[in-house]
UniProtKB/Swiss-Prot annotation:
Organism: Salmonella heidelberg (strain SL476)
GO MF term list: lipopolysaccharide N-acetylmannosaminouronosyltransferase activity
Metabolic or biological pathway: Bacterial outer membrane biogenesis; enterobacterial common antigen biosynthesis
UniProt similarity note: Belongs to the glycosyltransferase 26 family.
EC number: 2.4.1.180
Annotated InterPro entries: UDP-ManNAcA_Trfase_WecG (IPR023085), WecG_TagA_CpsF (IPR004629)
Keywords: Glycosyltransferase, Transferase
Role of this protein: Catalyzes the synthesis of Und-PP-GlcNAc-ManNAcA (Lipid II), the second lipid-linked intermediate involved in enterobacterial common antigen (ECA) synthesis.
GO biological process, one term: enterobacterial common antigen biosynthetic process
Pfam families in UniProt: Glyco_tran_WecG
Name this polypeptide is given: UDP-N-acetyl-D-mannosaminuronic acid transferase
Source taxon at top rank: Bacteria
Amino acid sequence: MTNNAAAPLYSLRGLPLIGWRDMSHALNYLFADGQLKQGTLVAINAEKLLTAEDNPEVRALIAAAEFKYADGISVVRSIRKKFPQAQVSRVAGADLWEALMARAGKEGTPVFLVGGKPEVLAQTEAKLRTQWNVNIVGSQDGYFTPEQRQALFARIHASGAKIVTVAMGSPKQELLMRDCREVHPHALYMGVGGTYDVFTGHVKRAPKIWQNLGLEWLYRLLSQPKRITRQMRLLRYLRWHYTGDL
């Protein structure tokens, strides 16, 4: 374990993860001394660790991100097992994004949204403005060609955005954030997957009781049985966890 400013780092499978105690700790860390940190936020769960193990390009993308945090309960439990004194809790990416947007609205921080279907993105913008008065300085749905990427990066740079959130799924969103940072480096980037869909009610999230019990994965599996193949991959992660191969 090493210290990273006001938050410790815990290594799993060679990747250093930030150990936030709770959401308040996460926000205070990202807005330390009234200055929003710059870099890339990546949510880490068991599935992402497995993918990083098998795909060198994904591992390089994740390793390059400054702020890797424990999004999955299995990752939190592994940290606690490997580091018994760790005071770390799960900070779900969807919850962190909402908290970040609420804080951005309060601070007047300019935000640029990328990804999602056009109608979902429009609803996300409207709800963010209504709910937290978020200063959205630009947006782009997820339907653009590779040839349009540089124009998008130029728009983001011209907007002066300090927070850029990208909902395209992994590893597409990590690739886009990496490339955009070459044009617009002075911002906090966050990959958010399907968060816009959840935020606007198009996708139902597990009830709070399931989340609090660490069973959100089971709720998703019961709601979407086709996920069983993906979930079977996690048996490998369980072996890592219980044999201490972390």
